[in-house]
Amino acid sequence: MATFKDACFHYRRITKLNRELLRIGANSVWTPVSSNKIRGWCIECCQLTELTFCHGCSLAHVCQWCIQNKRCFLDNEPHLLKLRTFESPITKEKLQCIIDLYNLLFPISPGIINRFKKAVKQRKCRNESDKSWYNQLLLPITLNAAVFKFHSREIYIFGFYEGSSACIDLPYRLVNCIDLYDKLLLDQINFERMSCLPDKLQSIYANNYFKLSRLPSMKLKQVYYSDFSKQNLINKYKTKSRIVLRNLTEFTWDSQIDLHHDLINNKDKILAALSTSSLKQFETHDLNLGRVKADIFELGHHCKPNYISSNHWQPASKIFQCKWCNVKYAFRDMDWKMESMYNELLSFLQSCYKSNVNVGHCSSIESVYPLVKDMLWHSITKYIDQTIEKLFDAMNPVQVNEQLVINFYWQIDIALYTHIKMILKTEALPFTFTLNQFNSIIKGIINQWCDVAELDLLPLCTEQTDKLVKLKEEGKLSEEYELLISDSEDDD
């Protein structure tokens, strides 16, 4: 079950390059870290075991032992995991690079077999070609890969993934790329590779090869924000940042194919890159559509719509004594932008509701309350216009000059007053609002900090290391630089 891990252990002494590339955490004496109860394939050692979250991308793809190396498939250091990684589209040339990598690092020849025979300690099964002694020689060349789908990007990590497991909680899926290469040609490569093995080992090798090389591909899974670890999030000044660790090298390659070309023809460059690499920490902002959706869902869950019926003059998030409006603990870990949006939305709705509906106290039970929660939950979905229209109708609009309008005369604070003027592009606020104006104000408050349409879909920790370095040099890793302020603010 751990053929790839065993091969890395035994082949690490074959060459100087192998000594550098085949050191994986699963073969070390380190104590494993705690498990996250997620069972799957570690993409570094390929064994089926319990996984934990990677320091480099915050996804669960590394085992409790390999996590000690702090390696990620998004590093730019040419370690073994990086060498097995390719980004879509997958071509025959890229697949040939994987085959050449296996042949280079895990060769099978009479000399290699004799070397392993001499290395095996004298035991009963020494000359019986038992699998337990020679498992490292049973590593066939297959084109199976674990695939991470980051919306438009697909990243393939090739490896020998044995066994079967449910993939419910895994951020990746296993696919077979043999049809993109040549099935008969790959068969021939493996037949030649196993020809030197004893008969008993040949049958096991062939069984391993055909069992995995003919596996059907799984349907790819889109990576969502819920797949990422929250353990490496820090909260400074009520702004969330993510700590990311990446392995860096000063050497660069134009493409992964060029990297593999140097692996074959310029090993000294690879060794120099490995020996001069360093582990660097990045503090990236966590502003993305996935997190905004999660925060808004939580905001709607904790929302106390009774506030719009109340006479409170304090912001909605600062009500602590009223049992109908108290959200004391809801914003303890909430992003400050969510709190600002919540305060302005409920203050505006309070002013509209108190101006049009005869309601006296926040203890009142009103039919509009579920619509307030719906407005928050639908604030960044296509249903927002329908929800706003229902909310407008709940304000008892009256028809004036063939238009439905609502009154607006209840008190609001000066910051909200200024913001609404900016949204409507007017010098003074009217005492009535049409549906279009009501709609524009709510959307303007929701979008006051960021344009949801232009947010990244996933956190920055899914980007390649080179891009993180570039963003850091430009000073754009911090959230302040990534906030897409609404155009209306620039027009003020």
From Swiss-Prot:
Please give one Gene Ontology molecular function term for this protein: metal ion binding
Location(s) in or outside the cell: Host cytoplasm, Host cytoskeleton
Q: Pfam families attached here?
A: Rota_NS53
Extract the ranges annotated as region (Interaction with host IRF3): 318-492
Q: Where is this motif: pLxIS motif?
A: 483-486
Keywords from UniProt, A to Z, are:
Host cytoplasm, Host cytoskeleton, Host-virus interaction, Inhibition of host innate immune response by virus, Inhibition of host IRF3 by virus, Inhibition of host IRF7 by virus, Inhibition of host RLR pathway by virus, Interferon antiviral system evasion, Metal-binding, RNA-binding, Viral immunoevasion
Alphabetical list of InterPro entries matching this protein: Rotavirus_NSP1
* Transmembrane regions: none
Q: Does the keyword Iron-sulfur apply?
A: no
Segment RNA-binding: which positions? Answer: 1-81
Q: Where is this region: Zinc-binding domain?
A: 42-79
Q: How does it assemble?
A: Interacts (via C-terminus) with host IRF3; this interaction leads to IRF3 degradation. Interacts with host IRF7; this interaction leads to IRF7 degradation. Interacts with host CUL1 and CUL3.
| Family to which this protein belongs | Belongs to the rotavirus NSP1 family.
| Domain text | The integrity of the zinc-binding domain in NSP1 is important for degradation of host IRF3.
Protein name as annotated: Non-structural protein 1
